[in-house]
Amino acid sequence: MLGEEASDIRAATFHSACVRILRRDIERLGYQSSFTIYDSDDSQRVIKACMTDLGISEKQLSPKAVLSEIGSAKDSLLNPDDYEERVGKDYRKTVISRVYREYQKRLFASNAVDFDDIINLTVRILTDYPDALEYYQNRYKYIMVDEYQDTNHAQFRLVSLLSAKHNNLCVVGDDDQSIYKFRGATIENILNFEKQYLSLIHISE
């Protein structure tokens, strides 16, 4: 495909597409558009500082494990309040809940986001600001997602929001090839696809 129409086609990962949205709209959430994206080492450094200031020993919980649990919470679109409500009497998760809350405060104070915030905050913008949602729904009228069986809840919610207006969504996936469950992939996203989109056309090899 050549010409002006082809220039409107964007190929991107979930995260690169969301970074583009955040650079334009993250100020709605109180961040600056020049926000920094922390990598795993940066995040663990902040987690360690939070744990130290909260009096939580690394012998009790490893910063890596805490960060992993927080990442899982973000993949499930659970903010610190949501996570705290769900921990119940689980002592380990109660401790992590305290770290999660402090961690997010420090990220915000540093105008920084971590890898899992990228999709999470984008979904928050699209959910809380109807004008932003409408803008991106019209910007992305046709959406195609590859390896759909490996999407997590946050990615599912993102795609659902963006495709809701025009309903032009194509997904490619095989429920027998899901390999990222350990990273939060939800096989139900593809198994329940036909229930969510009743007018779908199913093409198989």
Regions found by a protein language model. Give the residues of each.
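Short, glycine/acidic-enriched loop or turn micro-motifs at the edges of active sites
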Residues: S16, Q149-D150, Q177
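Conserved RecA-like helicase ATPase core segment
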Residues: H153-S204
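A basic/glycine-biased coupling hinge at the interface between accessory DNA-binding modules
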Residues: M1-Y142, N167, A185-I187, K195-L198
